[in-house]
Structure formats: structure tokens, C-alpha cells
A protein has these predicted regions:
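Conserved inter-motif catalytic segment of the P-loop NTP-binding fold
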Residues: 87, 95-98, 106-193
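Walker A/P-loop
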Residues: 101
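Residue-level signature of catalytic and energy-coupling elements of molecular machines
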Residues: 22, 79, 127, 167, ...
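Phosphate-binding/switch region of NTP-binding enzymes
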Residues: 195-230
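Detector for small/aliphatic-rich hydrophobic stretches
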Residues: 2-5, 16-93, 110, 114
Length: 230
């Protein structure tokens, strides 16, 4: 049976408090403390067993040579160290209206790979009109307008794309926790799940994130440390 309790955490530094505070005493940020619902499930320690097959000496671990996905943009390839690394999670942030979605859509329809573009902000028709302005070659780019993480993962399992795009992380929510869409716990939980998917499948995920009026990425500060590239 899951136990539920409420705590309050700072979006800026991650400090936690038993009650709401107008100013975070750790970093000094005002109005950055939000309610967070934590659900914990007690595990029976006697049922926990060690899987010895997962233990490997480092010299016995085999590595795979996975080629990076090359982008038709020399500057972006340079920034990413030569292209998109399989299984990596890339966070693209910027002010609203600056062109994040257009840039990522341009990449999606130009890399000649099967791309699943998930939008929680625009309709398929809006994305199609923008794609028409970018290029006539629009094959292998699949558009899904959805905000529920569980339904998104079902689409990923069905399509098994080469690249996944999330536009934007602030619009995605999971049924596994009760917090509202865009809240700090939702962003952390959804990002954590997407990272697991990327590492387990080898599918790189490009995540678009908004920034605040202060120029910081909206949501928990830890988000920047969870992903591979910002």
C-alpha cells in the first residue's frame, strides 16, 4: 500500500521544507517553493535478492560501436561532439517564440531517420504548416499530439523510432503521481522515465524546455543535471 505525504521543495536549488515558505532559505530565491506529493511504497526486504548476473568485472564488459546520427548542420554537429549519440537525452531550452520547435522540426525532417515528434502544445495541422515552410522532404517524421506519458510510451513501443522529440517537457504528465501538469514533481518524474527509455532502448531523445523570465530553465534545477546535453 502506497503512503502519500506532502513536502515543499525549491524549484531553484532543490531544498526541501515541511511547510510552504515565501523565500527559500538555502538559495534566497523568492516564490520558488512548491508543494510536492511523495508516494512511497514499503518493500519487504526479505524478498529482495541480488542478481549476480548483473555483476561484471569491467574488463569483461563488451561495448558496442554505435554511430552518431549526423545532423545537416555543421554547427549543431560540432556542439553535440559530432552528432547525436544513441541513447542520449538532449535538452534544448530558450525563450517562448525564439524558434526552438522550428529548429528541432527542421532537424527531424532532415536527418533521414524515423523520428517520433511528440507535441503537447501544437496541433498536427500547425506542425504540418511549419514543416511545409521548412522542406518538401517530410518522410519518416511522425507527429503525435499527446501529453500523457503512458500513451506516449505506447506509441514509442509501437513505432520504435530512431529519434524521439518531446515538445515540451513542461506539457507532459504521468499518471504515476498526482501532481498537476508542469509541476516540479511531474517534470522530474517524466524526465526520469524518458531517460530510462533512452538508456534501455538506445533511442536518443530531444527534449524542449522553456525558460523563465530570469533566463533559467523552467522547472527543477536538477533537470539540467539529469540529461546528457543542455
Amino acid at each position: 500500500m502506497a503512503n502519500t505525504k506532502k513536502i515543499y521543495s525549491c524549484n531553484n536549488c532543490g531544498a526541501k521544507y515541511p511547510k510552504w515558505m515565501g523565500q527559500c532559505s538555502q538559495c534566497g530565491e523568492w516564490n520558488s517553493v512548491d508543494e510536492e506529493i511523495i508516494q512511497s511504497k514499503k518493500k519487504n526486504e526479505s524478498n529482495i535478492t541480488i542478481n549476480k548476473s548483473k555483476l561484471k568485472e569491467i574488463k569483461e564488459i563488451e561495448t558496442e560501436t554505435n554511430e552518431r546520427i549526423i545532423i545537416n548542420d555543421n554547427e549543431l554537429n560540432r556542439v553535440l561532439g559530432g552528432g547525436i549519440v544513441p541513447g542520449s537525452v538532449i535538452l534544448i531550452s530558450g525563450e517562448p517564440g525564439i524558434g526552438k520547435s522550428t529548429l528541432i522540426l527542421q532537424i527531424s525532417i532532415s536527418i533521414n531517420k524515423k523520428v517520433l515528434y511528440i507535441s503537447g502544445e501544437e496541433s498536427q495541422q500547425q506542425i504540418k504548416l511549419r514543416a511545409n515552410r521548412i522542406s518538401d522532404n517530410q518522410t519518416q517524421c511522425y507527429i503525435l499530439t499527446e501529453t500523457n506519458l503512458e500513451l506516449i510510451l505506447k506509441s514509442v513501443e509501437s513505432l520504435m523510432p530512431d529519434v524521439i522529440v518531446i515538445d515540451s517537457i513542461q506539457t507532459i504528465q504521468t499518471d504515476s503521481i498526482e501532481n498537476i501538469q508542469g509541476s516540479t514533481p511531474q517534470i522530474k518524474e517524466c524526465t526520469s522515465t524518458l531517460i530510462k527509455v533512452a538508456k534501455q532502448t538506445g533511442i536518443p531523445i530531444i527534449v524542449i524546455g522553456h525558460i523563465t523570465k530570469d533566463g533559467n530553465i523552467a522547472g527543477p534545477k536538477v533537470l539540467e543535471h539529469m540529461v546528457d546535453v543542455v
